Amino acid sequence: MASSVDGGDSYAAIGEIGAPSPMGRLVTALEIGCDDRWDRRSFEVMLDGDAMLLESRSETAVLAGANLATVGGEIVQFAQAELVAPGKYRLSNLLRGRRGSIAATHPPGARFVLLDPLRLLAVDLPGELLGRALRFRAVGAGDAATPAVGLTLAGEALRPFAPVFLRVVSAGGDARFTWRRRSRSGFGWLDGTDAPLGELREAYRVTLSSGGTVRREVSVDAPFWDYPAAARAVDGIAPGATVTLRVAQIGDMTGPGIRASATFILN
């Protein structure tokens, strides 16, 4: 593999990959599901070549990290891979929304790529390349020239995950919104401790909307936001109003991360 930071005038080697990852496109839709729970539904994928193979693994192996794939931007795992036609598989017993991604609906034609660690190349690029247009190309043994693919680094692997467990408690017109952050530095459940921060400081961007209009946007440095009755009156949020809260943790290098949202009726 080689990359170019000067529009393709020159390329530098960045590493080697032994074999291509199985990839293809969805034949049937993958409907929205629940994050981090077993989904017993299935979807079908057509791989780009008959020589590409998928295999079933036990649920224990899947929980340990096997059969990880990206489907339209969501990270999915599957336990069962049934060959139903040449190059066509039915995948079932799914884990959705893995590695901080969001379980969403993906239509037929969405891209599928198996994330096999032995067939991936992780490249550690300097932060100053964020937002820059780079070019990459794969060069096989004996290849004289190969096409390049352009990519602008958006820093998705650096953005903080969306918070979870958005809640509100209201009394006497005052409201307190709370949430729980997640961390790229560790996403497992640990007894007696919180997830590591993963950033130099803890900060969040909070947006409150009602009726399709943003009523208030604030930044806070703790996983809660107090919304007093006086502020509600200024914003025109009457008792019984429906509001949408959006929260994103602020990253050191990328700014606001992936947003979480929830809708509430305020007393």
Segment roles from a protein language model:
Residues M1-N267:
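Interface-prone segments of viral and bacterial extracellular assemblies
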